[in-house]
Amino acid sequence: METPPEMPSTDGHTRAIVTERYVVESKKSAAHVPLACSTQHCAFPLDGSRLCVWSSKDPSHQLLTLQGHHQLITAVVFGNQIDPLLLCSASEDYIIMWNVAECREKTLKGLTPRGTILGSLLQTVLCLRFSLDDRAIAVCAGNKISVMDVEKQSVLVELKGHQGSVTAVEFCPWQAHTLISVSEDRSFKVWDFCVGSLIYSSSILTAYPLLNLLINEENQQLVTGSADGQLWIFSLMEGHHYHCVAHVDVRKKRETFTTRRMMAEQCSLPEDHQCRCRHEADKRGEAEATFPILSLAPCDLCLPDSQRGAFASECTKCLWIGSSTALFILNLASFELEAALHFKEFQSLSVQVAGSCAMVSEPMSAKAFCMLSSMFGSKIAVLEIDLAALLSTQQYPRAGKVLSVLASSCVLPTSPLYFGIIKEKFPKLANTKQHAVKSVVEDRPLVFHTKVRSSGYTLAPHMAMFSPKTNIKHHNKRSSKYKNNYKCKECSLENFLPRNLSRQVAVAQKPVAVSCLQFSGDGQKLACGLGNHLSLVFNASLSGPPAAFSGHDGAVSTICWSHDKRWLLSTGRDRTLRVWSVHRTELMLLLAPDAFPKPVTSAQFYYMDTFILLSSGPEFCLLKYHIDLCRDDIRRYKPKSRYKPIFRLPMTSGADITSLSAVNDFYSHIVLTAGRDRAVEVFDLNAGCSAAVLAEVHSRPVHRICQNKGSSFVAQHSLAYNLFLTAAVGDGIRLWDLRNLRLMCMKWAPAAFCTVLQDTQIRLLKWPSTQQLLSLSQPP
């Protein structure tokens, strides 16, 4: 028995991430010995049949050794109650219950502590689990689950139904009569142990045995892990029918976590060092062995608050994942890794490859304890992990200020946005007046008279002099011209989601796909692009005939309103971009297919209608445009509007852009782009360069980015504008925060495309409230 000194982290920080608090070597192999951890104690078998209890609160206490088993101990578990703290151990001969406090008192008095024998079995017990009140205990032996009464020391019920050995079992916290088990038959079952009946049986989840089980009480979810490093999260809410919420591959999540950190480091370095970092990233991205899920434990991760130098008041619900070579912290809201601790990075650890693992962390605590047994040796070690030090090393490096959608500084003279401001700051009044006179003459219809008379032969019409109206009656009513048909109503926060179909309109006589749609800024118009080359504009109430815009030779793929609601932008599969006049329903600006080398995938108005922002191939382009309102009635077919490319920038990876987004309702310097390499890149057009890269945002390329662009009817916190959504085929919808480039939440939707409405369903997803999102600490 030895207790080595504290070991500093390998990254050069003076604050130790991992401290090996206790090490013991057993006479028997410690490859798969059962381990148990509580908030104050750690229990493990020593030399096969001796049960040892180590105090994590006061390591100076003598190691408590409990003897009573004659065979190898195969299962150990602590009770859920603190006073008294119960400990149960099982072997092939006995199942013994121990009172930890009484056993320690007897040891201090020189007496031999004795436990209570609950029963004797001839089969190997693989799992033990107490109920919440410690009055019952579930014993898993073979494919059978026995629920025993602790006080009466009798078997209450036996549950049979698994085809393989039961590996883990849990009591449901909010349903006292419900018990859930997983087995080597690769399925989980839900039982009512009061009546001894089976409630639900899942299908086979994987080709590998299920090893662990955890119930998240706050979200009412079931988490189970397999031997090949896969996690399944199922909903236990009433009416959800145990549907799968998420499927997590720990190995892929670890690769994504590592790639994002290295991409962030690459963006923060000078350009001459980026090639070397990319080469190192390719070398580190080699495939490794899978991570078997040895243990699962809850973790209330309090993110560091840079302003206070402590922990934030709000904690993120996470999950400890113990594997053979590493420990991981998984965010249960976003299903992304918050931290990864690899044993090989700490060479002085006694256990480098674990055969068994157990973890525990107290709520609102900065420390966690982990217990490991050596796979290829006989050592058992207790590690103390400093969460604050671990998280500080796991943060993405960032060079410069924190990103924000709201512009926090003036436009730089070197910015491409500076061009548009200069041109509009000093308008030429003389030219404006001439255009106005010219438009009055040219906009008149052309009329051919049958009789032409010379001037002077007819009398001029009498002009009516101005006479003010003095008999106007005011009825405290607004003119019908300015009458607002949409009355403001106070919406209930509890029932604000629409649930019933209000109105349905057919956009065409034949079935046609609605490929895109967008409301105008005031919410009174709805534009949609169709697969039959048309663009339609409806009233928000879908009443009356729509305005039709025809001109594309292919399906309309993008449609966008201008901020002043005068113009409508559309792109189609004919590789053209068109700007329409909403009032005239006429084409005002045309970008031919040969304007760009590759098709335009996304386009929108930008910077309060000053520019047109579009993507073509691997780069996005900023266009300065001018709409000529002076139209010759004879040459109506020939638009005189013009455009000029002023700035373009490619993605860092060189991948083609699949979607882009920027705010047009107010001045913002941020542009978001998504590429076919499954990455999202953030560009700062004030600096004219890339600001950040989010690697492997989805398992498939992102086909849609949606930002919080504000509303004229709802007041929001300024930080709420930094939230944006991404969607990918078959990979759900994810909510991100631009301030720290973190995934905040993830939802799964059945529709393939969130903007295609043919043969799909519209699902309203509930996200975390604004207060919950704003309560998260800002990045340093």
Curated annotation (Swiss-Prot):
InterPro entries: Quinoprotein_ADH-like_sf, WD40/YVTN_repeat-like_dom_sf, WD40_repeat_dom_sf, WD40_rpt, WDR27. This is WD repeat-containing protein 27. Keywords: Repeat, WD repeat. It holds the Pfam family WD40. WD repeats lie at residues 3-56, 61-100, 111-150, 154-193, 200-236, 291-335, 342-385, 500-540, 544-582, 588-639, 644-685, 691-738, 752-779.
